[in-house]
Amino acid sequence: MSHLTTFLVFFLLAFVTYTYASGVFEVHNNCPYTVWAAATPVGGGRRLERGQSWWFWAPPGTKMARIWGRTNCNFDGAGRGWCQTGDCGGVLECKGWGKPPNTLAEYALNQFSNLDFWDISVIDGFNIPMSFGPTKPGPGKCHGIQCTANINGECPGSLRVPGGCNNPCTTFGGQQYCCTQGPCGPTELSRWFKQRCPDAYSYPQDDPTSTFTCTSWTTDYKVMFCPYGSAHNETTNFPLEMPTSTHEVAK
């Protein structure tokens, strides 16, 4: 076999392996209103009308990644504008994280033990109901999860903001809520979120019940906004306009 042929075979195998190893993410809007989906560090952003999907690929090793939805946005032809919830610096294609409140899907691909780590988090608050999980469930904690409770409608008065339910750290600050220095535990407010979304992260060290894993290399994922087709599984009155009154997966 010539050196050229050997190189071409090696290149083809490397390309196929890399392509196969890349995680495919589908982000689907099932809400009865427009959602401006966002994803970093891979993806950027996309406007999704009801029933539309957006696909992107995240390479192995992608970490500290987030997917979320933005509401009540207005962008010009150059992709500059503003969103009421989840805004990421006034651009359509996000380069950084969104401004709370926003319901988060978080993931890190191909980490230790050849596992993907992923979760739903309400540490940054809540704006849109969400489900997240592998397209083909596997053993153990490789199955779909959701956060679809009527959090906006039941939000405590101290956390209510237009279009969402804010998080205690942004609202009050301090170690008790932000958990930035050493160990910390749940608070009354984080328990309030946890009761409504038991699979979701409710405070930064909520790992035991909120981190999910799937085998790397072969797993694709789907994020769905409003999996029940409305605000949650009981009402269609969403998004709610309310009077005005960060955890990281495997690094």
Swiss-Prot record:
Leader sequence residues: 1-21
Up-regulation conditions: By tobacco mosaic virus infection and wounding.
Domain of life: Eukaryota
Disulfide bonds: C31-C226, C73-C83, C88-C94, C142-C214, C147-C197, C155-C165, C169-C178, C179-C184
Keywords per UniProt: Disulfide bond, Glycoprotein, Pathogenesis-related protein, Plant defense, Signal
InterPro entries from the UniProt entry: Osmotin/thaumatin-like_sf, Thaumatin, Thaumatin_CS
This protein's record includes keyword Disulfide bond: yes
Residues of this chain annotated as glycosylated in UniProt: N233
Entry's family note: Belongs to the thaumatin family.
Protein name per UniProt: Osmotin-like protein
Species of provenance: Nicotiana tabacum
Gene name of the encoded protein: OLPA
